Amino acid sequence: MSRRCAITGKGPMVGNNVSHANNKTKRRFLPNLRTIRVTLEDGTTRKIKVAASTLRTMKKQSN
């Protein structure tokens, strides 16, 4: 199971946890994925994982 947006390809990023003493340990920033239903041209329905930022953009462009 890949944590990747089906439309934009947005995936995990790598960064650091930084403590108060400035110690750094690696961590991953995961995209905010949402499962949505999409109706294809042939009438079938599929579930895809889409980032929340992609959903906002799609909603903005549909108006």
UniProtKB/Swiss-Prot annotation:
Family the entry assigns: Belongs to the bacterial ribosomal protein bL28 family.
A Gene Ontology BP annotation from the UniProt entry: translation
Entry-linked SUPFAM superfamilies: L28p-like
InterPro entries found in the cross-reference section: Bacterial_rp_bL28, Ribosomal_bL28, Ribosomal_bL28/bL31-like_sf, Ribosomal_bL28_bact-type, Ribosomal_bL28_sf
Domain of life per record: Bacteria
HAMAP family according to UniProt: Ribosomal_bL28
Transmembrane parts of this sequence: none
Keywords: Ribonucleoprotein, Ribosomal protein
Positions of region (Disordered): 1-20
Protein name as it appears in the record: Large ribosomal subunit protein bL28
UniProt cross-references to Pfam families, sorted A to Z: Ribosomal_L28
PANTHER family the UniProt entry points to: 50S RIBOSOMAL PROTEIN L28, LARGE RIBOSOMAL SUBUNIT PROTEIN BL28A
One cellular component (GO) term of this entry: ribosome
Gene Ontology molecular function: structural constituent of ribosome
